[in-house]
Regions:
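C-terminal accessory/tail domains of diverse enzymes
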Residues: 1-36, 65, 71, 132-326
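Short, low-order "capping/linker" segments at domain edges
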Residues: 51-63, 122-136
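Acidic, His- and aromatic-enriched active-site or binding-groove loops in soluble protein domains
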Residues: 59-80, 143
């Protein structure tokens, strides 16, 4: 949609480079927006903008999507945070993609930032997740045995006319052969640059941890698809207050506890990557209940005004502001 701006970083070696890149580019976007009497926010769904009033970007690609899919595309007034992490081979990318699926609810819980849609409090922490699942090639990735099976699947989708390229496969996590990466796409857009960097660090640590296990021949733990799907729903609905299933017997664990345990296990990896502080920032957000969707609802509750959410998030994204998640 024309109301959405996509900001891409360059290839970065570490999260400090990501932070610097984002600050520079978002500052540039803000400057251009301000010159045209506009402001920008980073949010999963705009709290009151009407999707019926938005214009689709006038390019052949997006107009083709609209013609092909109709209503599911027209209501895509949503924004996400996508993170690419480089991996050495297609086989490793498939293994990591399979292993990462169990962490989808953690990523939703940490990033959930869309409790309002079309002026309505939806009852979901991440409304964006359910809207995006309306696309025919979105949602959980299938569990694939190897890279050859992935290639065969892509060829089949092309031959059937379902897609023209991998760019039209909108799984929550996907191998990206053109970039040599695993791309994590499940997160809502989060309000601040620091939160973007924190989540990118968490994702990088997960992927690097899986990569090391793969290199050492250790079997990656994979949950049954029904468990992953149920956990995704629980995080979408309840955010950090969700209880998720941790094994096939139905044993439950609070999502917040699972996130903190996962971060603790990843600290050695974070130390080696130079991003321990970023993971500790996530612990603070979890412990203090400062997740973005909670901040949205708090901003609204002060005066019952949806415009207060937008004003608050405009300020949060200002590059030179220090955000205290209050």
């Amino acid at each position: 949609l024309e109301c959405i701006v996509e900001v891409n970083t360059n290839i970065c070696n570490n999260v400090n480079e990501v932070r610097k890149d984002l600050k520079n580019k978002i500052a540039e976007v803000q400057e251009i927006a301000n010159k045209n009497d506009n402001e920008i926010i980073s949010i999963g769904t705009h709290p009151f903008a009407r999707w019926k009033d938005q214009s689709v970007t006038n390019t052949n690609r997006y107009l083709d999507f609209l013609e092909k899919m109709q209503w599911p595309v027209r209501r895509l007034i949503i924004s996400g945070l996508h993170v690419h992490v480089g991996v050495e081979s297609g086989e490793k990318a498939i293994s990591i993609t399979n292993g990462m699926t169990r962490y989808i609810p953690l990523l939703i819980g940490l990033s959930a930032n869309s409790p309002f849609f079309d002026s309505e409090l939806t009852g979901l922490a991440s409304t964006r997740t359910k809207i995006f699942e309306g696309l025919p090639t979105a949602g959980l990735p299938p569990l694939l045995k190897n890279y050859s099976e992935f290639q065969k699947f892509m060829r089949t989708l092309k031959r059937a006319g379902t897609i023209d390229s991998i760019r039209e496969v909108w799984w929550d996590i996907r191998p990206h052969p053109s970039f040599g990466t695993v791309e994590i796409r499940v997160c809502d857009a989060v309000p601040t640059i620091e939160e973007m960097v924190n989540i990118a660090a968490f994702i990088q640590c997960l992927v690097v941890g899986f990569s090391e296990n793969y290199d050492e021949g250790r079997q990656l733990e994979i949950l049954d698809p029904w468990v992953i799907l149920e956990n995704k729903w629980r995080a979408t609905r309840f955010g950090l207050d969700a209880e998720i299933i941790i094994d096939e017997s139905g044993k439950l664990q609070p999502l917040k506890e699972c996130i903190l345990e996962t971060i603790d296990k990843l600290l050695p990896v974070a130390e080696s990557l130079g991003c321990r502080n970023e993971l500790e920032n996530l612990c603070y957000i979890v412990n203090m209940k400062k997740s973005p969707y909670i901040r949205q609802i708090s901003a609204f509750n002060k005066n019952n005004q949806l415009t207060d959410i937008v004003k608050y998030f405009i300020d949060e994204l200002k590059v030179h502001n220090t955000v205290h998640y209050d």
